[in-house]
Amino acid sequence: MSTPRPPSSHPERRFRDAMAQFATGVTIIAAPLKPGQYVGFTANSFNSVSLDPPLIVWSLARHSRSLAAFESATRYAVSVLAQDQVALAHRFSRPHVDRFAGVDFRLGAAGAPLIEGAVAWLECRHHALHPAGDHMLFIGEVEACALRTAPPLVWHGGKYLAAAD
């Protein structure tokens, strides 16, 4: 039996700690800027919204340096990472690095990077953008998707974990 952690006295920290108990998958969301240049970041704020049409949602902080690039992108791709891709998750969450240098990826039909070795890939067209507090919600219509059978990478309690059966 686990021992409950004492709650933080700061409401924002308590909210973050509570949300950290919700296990999520880990993705890299990427878009083309211009030929040979791409923008991408690690995200766990990703979910399906609708089956008809197929829609997904993800969020990006309003203070993110890549916000303007994604706001102007008409297409992007979501790569759902495999449990052996922790290094990629770290790389795409760090500022001031060429995130795509040396990374094995291919371009989808609309030119967005698809990370090799991921467990799923979704190629999306921009559908809607909504402000939500200190983040922007991006809704994408899935134009193509593919998957492979492999264990996904999981984010829980502020750390990366392997999925359990």
Provide a role label for each language-model segment.
Residues 1-165:
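Basic, polyanion-binding surface patches
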